[in-house]
Amino acid sequence: MSNTLTYVIPQLLAQGLMALREEAITARLVNRAYEPLAGQKGSSIDVPIPSAITARAVTAAVTMPANVDSSPTRVVITLDQWWEAPFQMSDKDLLEAAGGIMPMQASEAIKALANKMDAYLLGFYLKVPNYSGVAGTTPFVSTVAEYTDARLRLNKTLAPMTDRRVLLNPEAEANALKLALFSQADQRGDQGGVINGQIGRKLGADWFMNQNIPVHAGGSAGGTTTLSATMTVGQAILSIGACTPTDGTFAVGDTLKVGTGSTAVYFTVKTAATATASVAAVTVDVNAVSTASAGAAIEHPKGSQAINLMFHRDAFAFATRPLESSSQGLGNIISSAIDPVTGLTLRLEVSRQYKQTTFSYDILAGAQLIRPELACRILG
């Protein structure tokens, strides 16, 4: 295998440029409290979730009342994401290439791993049921209604008021920055938006832009869909009628809103489904915790939709553990470093082969959606 270094030979390259990078910062915004020690591929972290406790009245008596059992649950973070981004250069390449080629290629390698981890983390949106906004319509055209609706969902699910984040794609952020509430200093409260173009902390959340925001390919079923049969507590399959078109589809990760107003219940679609004669049996990710009568309205955002997010830090957990720097490197140079943009812990291994050197950055990580109720999609 040979390299093509036409564009890094000194006579053709006046100045090297570092890699252009996305704002792949999701890992900085989620819970990172589970990274104390180095780990190996396949190891896991148990995250305990406390069980609810009901207060009871105290009545003096000779005997004590019965003890109340508690049943905490757990969510497992498996460290199974092991990725590398290598590049190699021969001795001839190193002699001929401009002095800046090494940091340029290293920057590209780190960028590749950062984007991979960012996409991995953002991919957990598939199990986030709450949503605001309209599918296919970029939010914040004239108001912050999409944000306040998302904030309402987090407030109703008891999300802590601190450590709330908003992640927007470039189009949504551009719309938001046009609003006087964010761009004009007399309404914003400071000059941050005017000077550096960042929204910062506003309306009880920290706002960030991320070019890696995913686009979800939603199913085609729309119209005024309804429950065609009563929804009961613990039910995992919803019977949905009045689908348009009559053979409309529901894709994995689609959201469903059953009912209206303060009693509405949100679900995500677990298994793809297709309607037959306008009726579909749709398996949802979390069993129903309330009832709804047949005929209850169902809202199904359909088609292509950007998945901007509002979430509390503890909705997601992420752990990246440094792969050990071997004391028996067998001639290889192995060291660990932290990417200043994303905060990811990477390992660099430099290995000598026949007349060439291979540079390989790798990462071992894992993540999990710990509390889906603490996140909300802002559709675009």
Map each language-model feature to its residues.
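Surface-exposed molecular-recognition determinants
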Residues: 3-19, 102, 147-149, 170, ...
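Autoprocessing Asn-cyclization modules and mimics
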Residues: 141, 175, 181-294, 377-378
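Long, contiguous amphipathic alpha-helices that act as assembly "spine/axial" helices in icosahedral shell
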Residues: 47, 75-146, 155-172, 197-207, ...
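Residue-level recognition of conserved beta-strand edge/terminus positions
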Residues: 48, 258-259, 301, 362
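N-terminal "assembly arms/tails" that initiate or stabilize quaternary assembly
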Residues: 1-79, 375
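Signature of extracytoplasmic/envelope-associated structural regions
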Residues: 4, 108-137, 220-226, 242, ...
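Short, low-complexity, charged/polar segments at coil/turn and helix-coil boundaries
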Residues: 28-41, 46, 51-56, 144-181
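Internal mixed-charge
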Residues: 201, 205-214, 268-375
